[in-house]
Structure formats: C-alpha cells, structure tokens
Regions:
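Active-site-proximal alpha-helix that buttresses catalytic centers in soluble enzyme cores
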Residues: 1-264
Length: 264
C-alpha cells in the first residue's frame, strides 16, 4: 500500500499569531483537500528557522530535510505546494532541492506559486480588491509587495497593470525591495488628488515587513512617509494568506501540480 504525504513549503515567519492566520490557514485548507495524505511543513528561510529554534525550541525543516525524512519513512507519493507569491529566488531554491529527490518517489509533484498564469493575476486582483474596504471619493489602496532583484520582480508591475485593466483604478502595487518603489508611486497619488491611502501587505504573511516597513512608527516606514507627504493613512494588517480565495487557489495549484521530473 502506497504512503502519501503533503509537504507545504513556505518562506516562513517568526510571528506566530499571524502564521496561524495565514500559513496555518493555507496548510489546513490543503490538508482538507488531501485527506489521505500525511501533512508535513517546510520553510525556505534559514534565518527564520534558526530564530524559531533558538527562541522557541521549534524545529522546522528546510525542503531537503523534509524530503529526506519522507524518503526514509517509506513514502511513495508526495504532493508539494509552495506558498510563495512569485516564481523568484525562494521558488528556484525549492525546485533545486526537489530535483535531488525526483527519482526517490513514485510520484513527486509541485504546485505553482500564487502568481504564475494570467488567470492567477486576474483572480488575485479580484480577491485582493474585494477583501479591503470599499473606497470613498479621493481614497486609494496601496499594496506593499516584497520585491526582488530576480527577474520575477516583473510580477509586481504586471499586478499593478492587472488591477487597472480590470477597473480597479484606485489600487496600486509597490514593493519594498524592487520596482515599483514608493518613490515611484507617490507622485501619481498626488497627481490623482487622493486624500486617504489604505496600506496593506501584498505578502502571504503580515509579518516583519508589514509591521515595521509598512505600518511602523519609524520615519522611513511607508505610513510615516505618506503622512509626511500629506496623506491620511490607514494600515490593514492582513496577509494574503488570510483570504479564503487565496487559500483556494493554492489548493487548486496543488491539485494541478507538475511532476518534478518534468521541470528543468
């Protein structure tokens, strides 16, 4: 009889409360979709894994360690699902680790990151728009994405375009570490005459970036910078992983996963 496992691979977070609301919620939804699979968790951030071990005594595997254990425990069918937003460095690292095990299981599949196909962009735009407050006159929403120097950073301007294309003219996409930056967006917010800006994280978890870089009290936080520019600012500290529609998308990606053997 075959042994089946579900391995959910996330960047990770050291904020335990928001982890349960986001990564934990996605994991629970995936487990419901694969009831005959034993659940396993892995993080790709070595820094977060180290912090959890030293602070809480909690042990979380990297994908390689989790797969090694599954192989040694005799599992034959493994479904992997990443909770990464873009097909960036962390996803590349995940694939490189999975490829080492492509011949160790009868089946080893991986579901795509959140934003992979055109349909993904359209669906995420609608979900992200519906989950935030209804806008009044002279109000806008600014989502903060992580950003990257990986070519997959193109995801963020593409997402901004998708919002506008679908009619969400008052929703903007920025990044902390990529393009477009806040400096690129502020002039347009001023030109359009917005008075109030809702800030929200375009990240699975409302963790360190959301709490500090977005909503923090330091003068270089997005909240403080926008306030200094004359905007009223309200922060919405909810990660994308809290949205049921996003959880459902990850389940669909897992159900339609690609065999790791087929990946380059």
């Amino acid at each position: 009889m075959s042994k089946k496992a579900l391995l959910v691979i996330s960047f990770g977070t050291s904020y335990l409360e928001t982890r349960e609301k986001t990564i934990g919620a996605i994991e629970r939804d995936l487990q419901k979709g694969f009831p005959d699979h034993d659940f396993r968790r892995a993080f790709t951030s070595r820094m977060i894994i180290k912090k959890l071990r030293e602070r809480d005594g909690e042990i979380v595997d990297i994908p390689h360690e989790a797969l090694e254990k599954l192989k040694n425990e005799g599992y034959t069918e493994v479904v992997c699902q990443t909770t990464h937003v873009i097909n960036g460095y962390e996803y590349d690292l995940t694939i490189s680790e999975l490829k080492k095990f492509e011949n160790d299981f009868e089946t080893l599949t991986i579901g795509a990151p959140l934003l992979t196909t055109i349909d993904d962009y359209n669906r995420v735009a609608k979900i992200a728009a519906d989950e935030l407050p209804q806008l009044k006159r002279n109000e806008a929403i600014l989502y903060m994405g992580h950003g990257s120097d990986h070519h997959a950073n193109a995801t963020y301007p593409a997402m901004d375009y998708t919002f506008k294309f679908l009619g969400y003219k008052e929703i903007y996409m920025g990044t902390v570490e990529g393009f477009p930056s806040l400096d690129h967006i502020i002039p347009e917010l001023k030109e359009k005459g917005y008075k109030k800006i809702y800030l929200a994280p375009f990240m699975i978890v409302a963790g360190d970036h959301a709490i500090n870089d977005m909503a923090g009290d330091d003068e270089d936080s997005w909240k403080r910078i926008l306030e200094a520019e004359g905007f009223e600012v309200e922060c919405v500290l909810r990660g994308l992983g809290q949205f049921k529609g996003i959880q459902d998308m990850f389940l669909e990606h897992a159900k339609n996963g690609t065999s790791v053997r087929e990946l380059l």
